[in-house]
Amino acid sequence: MKKRLFIISQYLLPHHLLSRLAGCIAECRVRWFKNAFTRWFAKQYQVDMSEAQVEDVTAYEHFNAFFTRALKDGARPLDPTPGAVLSPADGAVSQLGPIEHGRVFQAKGHSYSVLELLGGDPALAQPFMGGDFATIYLSPKDYHRVHMPLAGTLREMVYVPGRIFSVNQTTAENVPELFARNERVVCIFDTERGPMALVLVGAMIVASIETVWAGLVTPPKRELKTVRYDEAARAPIHLEKGAEMGRFKLGSTAIVLFGPDQVQWAQELAAGSPVRMGQGLGLGLPKA
């Protein structure tokens, strides 16, 4: 009964209003408030500040600065294995595996369309049909910057408006096509393994999503927006393997997609496996 009421509330709550309010709180610079709130959060979620560049939680100008904190050099070593595909973020594997019949597995009894996930453009979705995916969930205690699984050159970025349901095991199991319904930012890179999609999915009280090249991406009008970066008028944007590409100001989930016969995920990884940014998720397959 409790679970059912929680799911019903997800449909009834004013998602974007709550997220705007959360954003105001997260940007508050009133010292006594932001210090008390940040201390409470760090204690409540057992945040490990020993690996942060700035360990004192009260030294951050606002909660968002704390939440998107940088780590000390060497805190996240990159897997040196040749051909390793890195985890883009700290968190836990939500799901990973093959993309079958154009759909990505979400949870028992649920999947969602690659086409819808990427914003509805068939040309964008086609290279990933029959490929592989990995979904990483970032919990509140985790490091919330997202990094490159492989070196890549940005080709296209798509902001896809949508709902902002909470993201957790309960909603994954009960909200159909959760990740293809929530607000998200789709980034398409050209890599040594062909096209790679890195999708940053928002969630309830996720105030904003940023990228290192565009800054704040989530626009106030909440309209589908596509920006192409492979045009002659734009300087190429190339990011090295392990480089930061974006961050969440609260929440949520990063999804990586590859085309067919490009990667093989590590056999020891499964739903629920903890991962850290820079850890190997799998290996690139030998080229034919």
Curated annotation (Swiss-Prot):
Signal peptide residue numbers: none
UniProt modified residues of type Pyruvic acid (Ser): S252
Site description Cleavage (non-hydrolytic), residues in chain: G251, S252
Cofactor: pyruvate
Membrane topology value: Peripheral membrane protein
GO biological process: phosphatidylethanolamine biosynthetic process
Active-site feature positions: D90 (charge relay system), H147 (charge relay system), S252 (charge relay system), S252 (schiff-base intermediate with substrate)
InterPro entries: PS_Dcarbxylase, PSD-B, PSD_type1_pro
Modified how: Is synthesized initially as an inactive proenzyme. Formation of the active enzyme involves a self-maturation process in which the active site pyruvoyl group is generated from an internal serine residue via an autocatalytic post-translational modification. Two non-identical subunits are generated from the proenzyme in this reaction, and the pyruvate is formed at the N-terminus of the alpha chain, which is derived from the carboxyl end of the proenzyme.
Catalytic reactions on record: a 1,2-diacyl-sn-glycero-3-phospho-L-serine + H(+) = a 1,2-diacyl-sn-glycero-3-phosphoethanolamine + CO2
Keywords: Cell membrane, Decarboxylase, Lipid biosynthesis, Lipid metabolism, Lyase, Membrane, Phospholipid biosynthesis, Phospholipid metabolism, Pyruvate, Zymogen
EC number(s) reported in the record: 4.1.1.65
GO molecular function terms attached to this record: phosphatidylserine decarboxylase activity
Domain of life: Bacteria
Cofactor remark from the record: Binds 1 pyruvoyl group covalently per subunit.
Pfam families: PS_Dcarbxylase (PF02666)
Places the protein is found: Cell membrane
Pathway: Phospholipid metabolism; phosphatidylethanolamine biosynthesis; phosphatidylethanolamine from CDP-diacylglycerol: step 2/2
CC per GO annotation: plasma membrane
Family note: Belongs to the phosphatidylserine decarboxylase family. PSD-B subfamily. Prokaryotic type I sub-subfamily.
Task performed by this protein: Catalyzes the formation of phosphatidylethanolamine (PtdEtn) from phosphatidylserine (PtdSer).
Subunit and partners: Heterodimer of a large membrane-associated beta subunit and a small pyruvoyl-containing alpha subunit.
Cross-referenced HAMAP family: PS_decarb_PSD_B_type1
Name listed for the protein in its UniProt record: Phosphatidylserine decarboxylase proenzyme
Gene name tied to this protein: psd
